[in-house]
Regions:
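A short, surface-exposed loop/turn module that caps and links secondary-structure elements
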Residues: 29-56
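Arg/Lys-rich, positively charged N-terminal/basic patches that mediate binding to nucleic acids
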Residues: 1-27, 107
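Active-site micro-motifs of SAM-dependent methyltransferase domains
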Residues: 11, 30, 85-88
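Residue-level signal for secondary-structure boundary elements
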Residues: 21, 36-39, 101, 105
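Enriched for short, Lys/Arg-rich terminal
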Residues: 55-61, 65-107
Length: 107
């Protein structure tokens, strides 16, 4: 399964320490093996799933959009939008998705 990392995701990972980067990599691997593991969001975030994992007694969230299962599509792509702690997580995610929609791009 192909992984597509969006800018907020990459910015957080770039600033993270090595042990946290490894934990994020493990979480991404879990999501890729079972894309339906995260909680489905509704409203402004419809179509987005959020997977939660713990690292050093802190809960982190990974926002992603699972692939659409179609028989004609051989290559499945998961879009990873954002990773971080709960503080301002959903506000940043909504802002990013709205910004992409305002520019005429499909997020």
């Amino acid at each position: 399964m192909k992984r597509n990392y969006k800018r907020p995701f990459l910015q957080f990972v770039k600033k993270a320490h090595k042990p946290l980067k490894l934990a994020i990599e493990d979480a991404v691997d879990v999501v890729c093996t079972t894309p339906d593991i995260g909680e489905m969001k509704t409203g402004d975030l419809s179509g987005i799933r959020v997977y939660k994992f713990r690292f050093n007694r802190q809960e982190y969230l990974v926002a992603y959009r699972p692939p659409v299962h179609e028989s004609a599509v051989e290559l499945l792509i998961i879009d990873f939008y954002h990773v971080g702690t709960h503080e301002n997580f959903y506000d940043v995610l909504k802002r990013y998705l709205k910004q992409g929609a305002d520019r005429g791009r499909i997020s």
